[in-house]
From Swiss-Prot:
This is Ribosome-recycling factor. GO terms for cellular component: cytosol. Responsible for the release of ribosomes from messenger RNA at the termination of protein biosynthesis. May increase the efficiency of translation by recycling ribosomes from one round of translation to another. It comes from Rickettsia conorii (strain ATCC VR-613 / Malish 7). InterPro entries: Ribosome_recyc_fac, Ribosome_recyc_fac_dom, RRF_sf. Gene3D superfamilies: 3.30.1360.40, Ribosome-recycling factor. GO terms for molecular function: ribosomal large subunit binding. Belongs to the RRF family. It is found in: Cytoplasm.
Length: 186
């Protein structure tokens, strides 16, 4: 493995860790309605489990409601069941093939718990970044040991790996700060 490939590989892994964080944070409920809230909902449909988005269209008519328009009448009860099983704290209100999900306002206690969870996700991501950095530094030591790079170059590349880690760590901080503001906004 050469040094350019190593840097690119580390950057891809760090980017992936950031994407995982984004995905986890989308699942956190803020006071505002968002169809992303239903990403984790699966529905028993036609003999298998399917994502909700494959059996219904999702929309947010206002800041406190998510509408689920089920395409097949026979699927309405399965969709309701899937939403209930997902344990999102939402109560489906059915009107024909339209299921309305009113988003209850978050209590201060719940907001604080969600912020703590967001910080935990952020810390887990930073741990992943540090593990990626460690793997990168070990690979650099191996390259130096195998005489592929000189000691000076090893030091320089190791600083670049640290800078990359710091950059992604600050991105994690800003994403968490933004999510915290989103959660705490009443």
């Amino acid at each position: 493995m050469d040094k350019e490939h190593l840097k690119k590989n580390l950057q891809e892994k760090m980017e992936k860790a950031l994407k995982v964080l984004d995905h986890e944070l989308k699942g956190l409920r803020t006071g505002r309605a968002s169809v992303n809230l239903l990403d984790s909902v699966t529905v028993e449909a036609y003999g298998s489990k399917m994502p909700l988005s494959q059996v219904a269209s999702l929309s947010t008519p206002d800041a406190r409601t998510i509408n689920v328009q089920v395409w097949d009448k026979s699927m309405v009860s399965s969709v309701e069941k899937g939403i209930t099983i997902a344990n999102l704290g939402l109560t489906p209100a059915t009107d024909g093939q339209l299921i309305r999900l009113p988003i209850p306002a978050l209590t201060e206690e719940r907001r604080t718990a969600l912020v703590k969870l967001a910080h935990k996700y952020g810390e887990d991501t930073k741990i992943s970044l540090r593990n990626i950095r460690r793997d990168g530094n070990e690979a650099l030591k191996k390259l130096e040991k195998d005489n592929v790079i000189a000691k000076d170059e090893h030091h320089s590349l190791s600083e670049q790996v640290q800078k990359l880690t710091d950059d992604y760590s600050s991105k994690v901080d800003s994403v968490i700060k933004q999510k915290e503001q989103e959660i705490m906004t009443v």
